[in-house]
Amino acid sequence: MAIPTVYVASLSAFVAGVAISLQYYALPYAVVLGLLAAYLPSFLAPTQFSQRGGYWPWFATLSLWKARAPVPTTLHFETPLAKETQYLFSSHPHGPTSWHHGVMITGASTPAFHDVIPGDRRRHLGASIVFRIPIYRELLLWLGVVDASRSVAHSVLASGKSLVILVGGIQEQMLAEYQKHHVFLHSRKGFVKLAIQHGTAIVPVYAFGENDLFRPSTFLLPLRQWFARKFLIAIPLCVGPTWWNPFKPFPVEIHQVYGHPIPTTKCDNPSSDEVDRVHGLFLTELQRIFDKHKAAYATPDATLEIL
């Protein structure tokens, strides 16, 4: 089996880094500098822009993810999904932390998402900014996350893999309210056009409990919303039940409901009428699964606000 180029480059950089550093520093410092040099090829590699990404099956399916999950998550399917079929999953709400997306990525649910759609047959889109964070980017790449650019999304679907998108994006994230149900979708039609261009069925997904995990703060919210629009970087401020551990969520359960797949007819250049038609079907199905399950997983009088 061929050794990936990035590993060869990392080994070369490590040896060169240590050799050069030894001329100026003691061995421990030289090793540290060598390790930093060895990491550079991985950090600079454009792996996130490839549909293949850096998916590592062993890492992505570790039982540790579910064992350490602080809240239980259950997946519910209106229709059984076929492992060999390609889907575009549009998951909502984003929430302040997109917790349910992390659960999908790691399989920390019952059943595990990778038992439904295997990890090597799907990719998840992640904001470009996260791939600029050292080490964290590698963790995401190993879990099957790639850059949320249009070209990458096209290449993933063209390869036959399924795709998971948080369509609401930063806007939906910044609109998150504790125990409220907002989705930012009326103007979001690009994912529908993308699915039609590849003839891929769209699956609406709603995660009850996502907006119950943390209490978002409205502190400087207008400024943070402006910053998010200007620089495409969200700055969520939220807390859990304890002030000394703000990263611990409230003890709630997440119930992630998958609606009926919405079929599309492949067309390289779909008309706006066709995009609107499929978009309308998507909104209707998302509303249907919300209304059907809200009494069991939220409250009977809960309402879904589509913005």
What is each stretch, according to the model?
Residues 1-40:
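Alpha-helical bilayer-embedded segments of polytopic membrane proteins, i.e.
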Residues 63-83:
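A short, well-structured juxtamembrane/interface segment
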